[in-house]
Amino acid sequence: MDVLLLNGPNLNLLGSREPDYYGTQTLDDITSNLTKIANNVGLTFEHHQDNSEAKLIKYIHNAVDNGVQYIIINPAAFTHTSIALRDAILAVGIEFSEVHLSNIYKRENFRKQSYFSDIAQGIISGFGPQGYEFALQAAIQHIQQLERL
C-alpha cells in the first residue's frame, strides 16, 4: 500500500456533525474520491477512521510492514492531546501531512495547539474536504520523487 489515510475521533459523523465547520460530505464521499485519484496515478490507497487512539497507533505501527510510503492524518481531537500518536509517527519514520477540515487557528484557543504540526511535511487546515485532495497531491509528489531516486 502506498498511501495511508487515518481519521481520528468523530470523523465518522461527517455530513451530519456541525456542517458549518465540517461541511456536508460524508467520510465515505471523501475517501471514495481520494481512492479514485490515487488509483488514477497507479497508487494504492487505504483509509481507516477510528475513535480509539490505540487502534490508530496500531495502524501507524503496521504501516512500515504494509509498504506505506506516505501517511495523511486528520487526528481530529487527538491533535491537541495525543503525544502517543505523535510518537508513533516519529517511530515509523514515514513522511506525513496533517489535515483539518476546519481552520483550527480560527477556532477555540485549545484547538490551536497541535502535537503534529512541527513534525509534519505540511499542514492543510480550513479547506474542507478539498484539504484531503491537497494532501494526497503532496503524497503523490513525495512518492514520485522517491521513485526517481
Curated annotation (Swiss-Prot):
It catalyses: 3-dehydroquinate = 3-dehydroshikimate + H2O. Pathway: Metabolic intermediate biosynthesis; chorismate biosynthesis; chorismate from D-erythrose 4-phosphate and phosphoenolpyruvate: step 3/7. Substrate binds at N74, H80, D87, L101, S102, R111. The record marks R17 as: Transition state stabilizer. One of its GO terms (biological process) is aromatic amino acid family biosynthetic process. InterPro entries: DHquinase_II, DHquinase_II_CS, DHquinase_II_sf. Its EC number is 4.2.1.10. Catalyzes a trans-dehydration via an enolate intermediate. This is 3-dehydroquinate dehydratase. The lineage of its organism: Bacteria, Pseudomonadati, Pseudomonadota, Gammaproteobacteria, Candidatus Pseudothioglobaceae. The gene is aroQ.
